[in-house]
Every structure is written in structure tokens, then in C-alpha cells.
């Protein structure tokens, strides 16, 4: 229930990236910024029993380099066991494209034909990145003959996520 979710928050403890924390006898953890979304991390877990220590790494999505709003990922160099999400593990993403030029071209061509641009997007991460690029396009006055244009985000979750990005600008 919502009450259960709110009540459990009293047990949350913020853990900074990069600091080893002993959470129990023989168990140490460290969070690493994985560069996927704001606040995302992988976790390294060291398990010690007698003279034997094993290192496990748990990770979800791993981010890309040179993203406009997210720091580059930090990688763990070694582990005894790795457990991770791998939705795109079988795909090569290729080189980073010039998204600003591509987006400018789409907006310009659509406006020239009298249309509106509708961009479906994930509420967290992608929407904020698109807003960043659109702001850059507007600041550089890249769209010709159409003046300033209105941008609407029609997703309550995306609006709330954008507020969180704005509140944590120092993490970008």
C-alpha cells in the first residue's frame, strides 16, 4: 500500500558513491555511479567468511559516455560473480550521433509543412534529454522562420522527473 511505502522510507540510509560501507559482520558494500539515469548505481558486495572473500557485482542498465545530463559510467574492474540486466546486451549501438542536428532537421521540416512535432519518450531520462536538446536548439536559434515555439510535456511522471533533475543539477 501507499502507507507501507511511506512508512518504510524511515529505514532508508543515503549511501554516497565510491565509499565502502560495512553493513554487517563480513559484508561490505560500495555503490558505483553507473551512468544510466540520475541516481542509478551498481553495487559491489564483498562477502567474507573465515579466510575466504568473494566479490559480487549487481547492476541494472549501464549508461553511455558523453550524455548531456548524466555523468559517464564508472566500471568495476573485477568480480567473482556479476549479475546484471542485459536487455541490449546483444546489440552494438554504434557511434554517438549528432542528435541536435537531427532533431533540428525534423522540427524544421515539420514546421515548414505546418505540422506539430510529437515525440513519444520514456518519462525518466529520455524526456529530460530531449528537453535539453530542444533548449539548445532554441538558444542557438536553429529553427528558422518560425520564431519561438511552444514545448509541451504531456506526462505527469515526466514533469515530476524533470523537477527531480532540476533539484539535483549538481549531480549532472
Annotate each language-model stretch with its function:
Residues 125-126, 146-168:
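Short, conserved secondary-structure transition motifs
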Residues 170-172:
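Ligand-binding beta-strand-loop-alpha-helix segment within the catalytic cores
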Residues 1-129, 135-144:
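His/Asp/Glu-rich metal-coordinating catalytic cores
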Amino acid at each position: 500500500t501507499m502507507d507501507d511505502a511511506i512508512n518504510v522510507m524511515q529505514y532508508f540510509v543515503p549511501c554516497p558513491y565510491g565509499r565502502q560501507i560495512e553493513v554487517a559482520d563480513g559484508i561490505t558494500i560500495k555503490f558505483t555511479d553507473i551512468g544510466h539515469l540520475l541516481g542509478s548505481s551498481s553495487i559491489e558486495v564483498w562477502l567474507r567468511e573465515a579466510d575466504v572473500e568473494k566479490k559480487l557485482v549487481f547492476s541494472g542498465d549501464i549508461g553511455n559516455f558523453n550524455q548531456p545530463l548524466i555523468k559517464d559510467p564508472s566500471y568495476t574492474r573485477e568480480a567473482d560473480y556479476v549479475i546484471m540486466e542485459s536487455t541490449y546486451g546483444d546489440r552494438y549501438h554504434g557511434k554517438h550521433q549528432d542528435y541536435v542536428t537531427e532533431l533540428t532537421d525534423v522540427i524544421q521540416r515539420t514546421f515548414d509543412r505546418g505540422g506539430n512535432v510529437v515525440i513519444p519518450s520514456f518519462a525518466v531520462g529520455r524526456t529530460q534529454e530531449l528537453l535539453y536538446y530542444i533548449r539548445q536548439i532554441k538558444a542557438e536559434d536553429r529553427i528558422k522562420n518560425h520564431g519561438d515555439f511552444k514545448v509541451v510535456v504531456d506526462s505527469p511522471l515526466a514533469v515530476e522527473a524533470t523537477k527531480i533533475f532540476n533539484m539535483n543539477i549538481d549531480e549532472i
